């Protein structure tokens, strides 16, 4: 890990726009991108593939320690290609089932510890955009700049519905909303690394903001923090 490489963390709940903004920032700055949520989704999918119970912390932790996952440069539709045990799972990890399973395995303290070093290894020159739920509070507490994106549960459910519809999934928006509210509660109230803004993070409510507006706010803040740190 390069301690000198700057890190910008982007945390927040599911559907707040973290993934989109993170990809745009990484492309704009020419930095590395860490989608930490994808790591937990891959772990959840691996558990499902290997018939490991999602409630079994010991087995999930063992699986996490030996997780065979690679992140490759993708295409415009999927900027990051995710490979699990030699298989392309980029689309498979984006299902709602996988998302819910990821939230369950992410609640285990030993699982989070097992994946901590792997996440920190993404910090390489010229810099890193780290997208997740505890990037600014736990994984990179001394990050150069920290952002926290949020939005109403209703807006996030609508975004998720549109996203899944575009990918050809048949989904129910009422069920999506209920699952988002349930996941928010689970993520925000877990005893280890709960979903909360870092004290020094810039909080942006994206409910009524377009992508360009959020990106401009983020870039202005990042440039300000980087120039101050230098």
Curated annotation (Swiss-Prot):
Its EC number is 2.7.4.25. The lineage of its organism: Bacteria, Pseudomonadati, Pseudomonadota, Gammaproteobacteria, Alteromonadales. One of its GO terms (molecular function) is ATP binding. It catalyses: CMP + ATP = CDP + ADP; dCMP + ATP = dCDP + ADP. Transmembrane segments: none annotated. It is found in: Cytoplasm. Keywords: ATP-binding, Cytoplasm, Kinase, Nucleotide-binding, Transferase. This is Cytidylate kinase.
């Amino acid at each position: 890990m390069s301690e000198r490489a700057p890190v910008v963390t982007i945390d927040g709940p599911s559907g707040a726009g973290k993934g989109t903004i993170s990809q745009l920032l990484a492309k704009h700055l020419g930095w590395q991108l860490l989608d930490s949520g994808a790591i937990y989704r891959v772990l959840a999918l691996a558990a499902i593939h290997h018939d490991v119970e999602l409630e079994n912390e010991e087995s999930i932790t063992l699986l996490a320690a030996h997780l065979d996952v690679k992140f490759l440069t993708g295409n415009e539709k999927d900027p990051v290609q995710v490979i699990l045990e030699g298989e392309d799972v980029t689309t498979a990890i984006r299902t709602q089932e996988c998302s819910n399973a990821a939230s369950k395995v992410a609640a285990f303290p030993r699982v989070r510890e097992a994946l901590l070093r792997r996440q920190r290894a993404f910090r390489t020159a010229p810099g890193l955009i780290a997208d997740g739920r505890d990037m600014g509070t736990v994984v990179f507490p001394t990050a150069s700049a920290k952002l926290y994106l949020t939005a109403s549960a209703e807006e996030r459910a609508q975004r998720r519905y549109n996203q899944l519809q575009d990918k050809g999934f048949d989904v129910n928006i009422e069920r999506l909303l209920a699952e988002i509210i349930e996941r928010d509660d689970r993520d925000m109230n877990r005893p280890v690394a709960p979903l909360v803004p870092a004290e020094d993070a810039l909080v942006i409510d994206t409910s009524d903001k377009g992508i360009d507006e959020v990106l401009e706010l983020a870039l202005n803040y990042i440039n300000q923090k980087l120039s101050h740190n230098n």
